[in-house]
From Swiss-Prot:
Name by which UniProt lists this protein: Glycine cleavage system H protein
This protein's encoding gene: gcvH
Assigned GO CC terms: cytosol; glycine cleavage complex
Function: The glycine cleavage system catalyzes the degradation of glycine. The H protein shuttles the methylamine group of glycine from the P protein to the T protein.
Source organism per UniProt: Aeromonas hydrophila subsp. hydrophila (strain ATCC 7966 / DSM 30187 / BCRC 13018 / CCUG 14551 / JCM 1027 / KCTC 2358 / NCIMB 9240 / NCTC 8049)
Cofactor notes: Binds 1 lipoyl cofactor covalently.
Keyword Cell cycle attached: no
Length: 129
């Protein structure tokens, strides 16, 4: 069974988001998602400064099995991307909730977080697959 940290929020499309005290947030894909995809070979990240809407596809994870779109769980401006993934995409596999983060985003509307799932809700989504 996949690890689902309780302090994060989740999208049904298997992204996680961690909101920080300064109103910025970090986004990545869940352990469950990386298990389904398999070994990462490349991650195409969004451009810094790009505006994205909640649910917009903004990145692509390419693994030995498939390429999968990654969606922004919230609306906002991309502030930074994890440049470590350029040379080490496998960090998404080995540490999906830590060193394998994908991008930082400045939230346009913190109210959108209410549309996301807590750990229990996300576990139910995983169980239904």
């Amino acid at each position: 069974m996949s690890h689902i940290p309780s302090e994060l929020k989740y999208a049904t499309s298997h992204e996680w988001i961690r909101v920080e005290a300064n109103g910025e947030a970090v986004v990545g894909i869940t352990e469950h998602a990386q298990e389904l995809l398999g070994d990462m070979v490349f991650v195409d990240l969004p451009e810094v400064g790009k505006q994205v809407g909640a649910g917009d596809d903004c990145a692509v994870a390419e693994s030995v099995k498939a390429a999968s779109d990654i969606y922004s769980p919230v609306s906002g401006e991309i502030l930074a991307v994890n440049e470590e993934l350029e040379g080490s995409p496998e960090l998404v596999n080995s540490d999906p909730y830590g060193a394998g983060w994908l991008f930082r985003i400045k939230l346009d509307d913190a109210g959108e977080l209410a549309n996301l799932l807590d750990a229990e809700g996300y576990q139910n989504v995983v169980d239904e697959e």
